[in-house]
Amino acid sequence: MALNRLVFSLSLWLGFIGAAQAASSEPLPPSKDPWYTAPPGFESAEPGTVLRVRPAPGNLTSITANSSASYNILYRTTDSHFKPTWAVTTLLVPELGPDSLAQQKFQQSALLSFQVPYDSADVDASPSYSMYSASNDSSAPYTAALGSGLFVSVPDYEGPLAAFTAGIISGYATLDSIRAVLSLGLGLNITNSPRAALWGYSGGAFATEWASELAVQYAPDLVAGPVVGAAMGAPLANITTFMHSVNGQATSGLVPNTLLGLTSQYPDVRKYLVSKLNDDSEYNRTGFLAAEGFTVTESGVAFAGIDINKYFQNGTDILNDPKILALVNREGIMGYHGVPKWPLFIYQAIPDEVTPISATDALVEKYCAVGADILYERNTVGSHYEETNNSYKAAVQWLEDVFSSQHDINRAQGCVIQDVTRNTTSGDLVRRKDVQKSVFDLWSAAW
């Protein structure tokens, strides 16, 4: 094992030197960038081992507010079959120095793992590439965190097969991204009891929750050490109810993305799924499989308002097909792989039209019955998308508590479930066009 670590360390830094020389080149989509491959023999490395690192190509640092440097890190992780695979995370470094917020507030030792809801079965939609064209709305949380002195890791948690809604690999890849960053440093003070927290909304909360419940068995080192908590909004607790909720609605494009993402690691189930598609009709195989190359926005346009069952022979109810349900039960139902040991803040709008709150209620009830530490806030107003703004402040304040150890004082509180009313989208606190500035102000006020 020591020899393997030595070999990987040598190849890593040789690769880093070469990458640094080419850092000014434009980013390539992962499917066309040879850097997105693991070196020979990576399978023998331990989960979380760094396999490659490079300064992020192109202008990512300059276009990401409050960032002083950015790196791509390719690391060893584990797929849903419990076999070695790899994933990539992008590490964003805040402004550093003796007078920086990173030093004054956190001694350069605080890491936020931010899971972006990229919700796509296309590997080229992975954050390490899509961040170059991210809107202010989607980048606001992590750029604001950078502005408050946090290091930010943004993992491509779906892995190299873009396994959207595959909970096992999503959780493992998220956990191993934290391990990889903490082993590497790159400005992060890893000798001064570093603290890490996770945050995600919707698809990003899906990965955040799976990481939290899998950590007990997969990453006890993170449970016992640096991870201090996880915040998650509208976490897609049950993928079956989620797909039924969005099918035929404006967000119907999430269904093909889910079915293709779920089956990307299961060739037999993918073959079965494809065999059930129509050969020729308005809703045919070609149209459905086009989602493999779509971002979530593109799928939203292509499939808006369509009952996805129309793509299947005789209108088959594919969402209730036994083979599909068996896979969902393995990969898409939370609460069956372990009880999170670090504190959780879970928030969701009661009227959520994308993922029914009843599934989140059931998950929280299950965890609370076995002693989990959860603050669960159910917002009486707002849609799925409005809740991203409505509960920004609450999430930021809760993360401030766990980073500053204030939550540790009150850990005996156990589960707290409460209905709240937050309607910041009306303009009282956060207007959509001003979300970047407002979220930065929230982080700044917290610390």
Curated annotation (Swiss-Prot):
| Signal peptide span | 1-22
- Glycosylated position list: N59, N66, N136, N189, N238, N284, N314, N389, N423
Q: What class of enzyme is it?
A: hydrolase
* Record-level Gene Ontology MF annotations: triacylglycerol lipase activity
Query: What is one Gene Ontology biological process annotated in the Swiss-Prot or TrEMBL record?
Result: lipid catabolic process
Q: Which residues form the active site?
A: S202, D352, H384
Q: Write out the entry's keywords from A to Z.
A: Glycoprotein, Hydrolase, Signal
InterPro entries with a match to the protein in the record:
AB_hydrolase_fold, Lipase_secreted
Q: In which pathway does it act?
A: Sesquiterpene biosynthesis; trichothecene biosynthesis
Tell what triggers its expression.
Expression is positively regulated by the trichothecene cluster-specific transcription activator TRI10.
EC number in record: 3.1.1.-
Q: Which family does this protein fall into?
A: Belongs to the AB hydrolase superfamily. Lipase family.
Instruction: Give the protein's biological function.
Output: The biosynthesis of trichothecenes begins with the cyclization of farnesyl diphosphate to trichodiene and is catalyzed by the trichodiene synthase TRI5. Trichodiene undergoes a series of oxygenations catalyzed by the cytochrome P450 monooxygenase TRI4.
Other remarks on record? Answer: Trichothecenes are sesquiterpenoid toxins that act by inhibiting protein biosynthesis.
Q: What is this protein called?
A: Trichothecene C-3 esterase
Organism this protein belongs to: Fusarium sporotrichioides
